[in-house]
């Protein structure tokens, strides 16, 4: 159950992502793993992108708020399950 009042600001999303990373509660959907494999993005790469990337404003997609986290050549899309739990929905390399 998601108890967050979403959407959150990009800076709050970054704080929540860092909390999820610190607690070790970042999960990957099967879709994310498939898309990451297609682009040669490892789970470690995705976690690094979440840690160092810039968070864009949330988008409401398929009944949940999703936040793109962008670095120069890749994007990871995450959603929150709680204030300290995140799920990677998809990821891709920018070509």
Language-model features: locations:
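Ribonuclease/tRNase effector modules and their secretory precursors
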Residues: 1-95
């Amino acid at each position: 159950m998601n108890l967050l009042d979403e959407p959150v600001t990009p800076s709050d999303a970054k704080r929540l992502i860092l909390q999820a990373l610190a607690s070790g509660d970042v999960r990957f959907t099967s879709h994310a793993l498939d898309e990451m494999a297609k682009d040669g993005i490892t789970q470690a790469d995705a976690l690094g992108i979440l840690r160092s990337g810039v968070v864009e404003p949330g988008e409401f997609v398929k009944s949940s708020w999703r936040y793109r986290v962008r670095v120069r050549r890749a994007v990871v899309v995450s959603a929150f399950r709680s204030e300290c739990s995140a799920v990677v929905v998809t990821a891709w390399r920018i070509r």
